[in-house]
């Protein structure tokens, strides 16, 4: 059921907003003790707002587009008066005094914030296993991870606990869990959506975007949250097009480039490769021209990212010292001891690992060899994309090299965990928009994600291609069973 379907049902009185919210709360109470996709459920607040919207509907008031629709928020987005933890012990009791720009825009559009979702601590992870509040499980198979870092946002949509959600994407944290959970996830162009109120991981890479069960709903959410924000100097003052108008456009004559580097990688699972290539054939049948294209430095993205992102994290997370807010170690005899102990006890092992990597990369004697060199390679990766978009409209690749891996399989193997973002990281380094949507299933019935990458501020083209594929393939109509048998 799309947002448009929900609007019609609300307008006709076939269903009330309170009934929609109560149904999702009941489902959360039934299923989330197993999944652990939510950290906070705003039961009273959500029902109260739903009642208010129902009164407005009954009065015939003109309402904004998302009125009465329950949407979940990743717990690294500040929500005024509602605890925001970043899934970390160090922020366990942090209640923001202000609202992030994107959540404010959603609320102004009438959306009902049903809760805050679980995530990898400080968005550092690819499996939602590094959360201080326990891992999230994949609703398609609870022995598998949902991906990360936005695993709670993806799993909650896939399991029908909300109609859409917000996540953040630094190296693939929207697209990879979207792939693992069989939903649509969009990472916008860097600067399209405000980061004001997003708790920073890597400021030159972070971007907020939507999860939804279908392309049109993802387009609606992005439409609402996009645009210039005076509170975020990195947002760009470029008009936001009407994404919904692009959905019905034919893709006949569009050039779509298969990034050949992706399909030659030894870590790419056979089921994933076959499904994505089959998807390319379907797009060709819909009128697109499919061409092979090379991005020579595409596979250098992961090494580049794991210098730049930890370096920025090292600087951004220096503010958590136990002094003004967050977790504070007790009974220490000096400020240095208190700060050291607060950080040692407050941060989890993966966060500490990345802080150490970043601090090392920025240290005297190594900054030229690592950080500056990584920034140079980042520029070369962007140039490869620039060259590619002179020849094609959209690029096509798998979202992830594999389907969802087993819970616990990679938690003690950082390199294996990091490689799951191999195919998503380049778009972040180049600041490009990219979308993941379900395109098939592996032999075990786990979802496979198709990734489309666009040129800067061309989210509309991605929605256009994605929607035409979605309508033709109808993969999105398959939903996970929720008896959660092993």
From Swiss-Prot:
Q: Which PROSITE patterns match?
A: AMIDASES (PS00571)
- What Gene Ontology cellular component terms go with this record? glutamyl-tRNA(Gln) amidotransferase complex
Keywords from UniProt, A to Z, are: ATP-binding, Ligase, Nucleotide-binding, Protein biosynthesis
Q: Which SUPFAM superfamilies match?
A: Amidase signature (AS) enzymes
A Pfam family annotated for this UniProt entry: Amidase
Q: Which GO terms describe its biological process?
A: translation
User: In the UniProt entry, which residues are flagged as the active site?
Assistant: 74, 149, 173
Q: Which InterPro entries match?
A: Amidase, Amidase_CS, Amidase_dom, AS_sf, GatA
- Name one molecular function that GO assigns to this entry: glutaminyl-tRNA synthase (glutamine-hydrolyzing) activity
Q: Among its keywords, does the record have ATP-binding?
A: yes
EC class name: ligase
Q: Does the keyword Nuclease apply?
A: no
Reaction(s) catalysed by this chain, per the record, are: L-glutamyl-tRNA(Gln) + L-glutamine + ATP + H2O = L-glutaminyl-tRNA(Gln) + L-glutamate + ADP + phosphate + H(+)
What's its EC? Answer: 6.3.5.7
This chain's function reads: Allows the formation of correctly charged Gln-tRNA(Gln) through the transamidation of misacylated Glu-tRNA(Gln) in organisms which lack glutaminyl-tRNA synthetase. The reaction takes place in the presence of glutamine and ATP through an activated gamma-phospho-Glu-tRNA(Gln).
Its assembly, as annotated, is: Heterotrimer of A, B and C subunits.
Q: Which family does it belong to?
A: Belongs to the amidase family. GatA subfamily.
What NCBIfam families does this protein's entry cite? gatA
Q: This chain belongs to which protein, by name? A: Glutamyl-tRNA(Gln) amidotransferase subunit A
**What is the species of this protein?**
Prochlorococcus marinus (strain NATL2A)
**Gene name on record?**
gatA
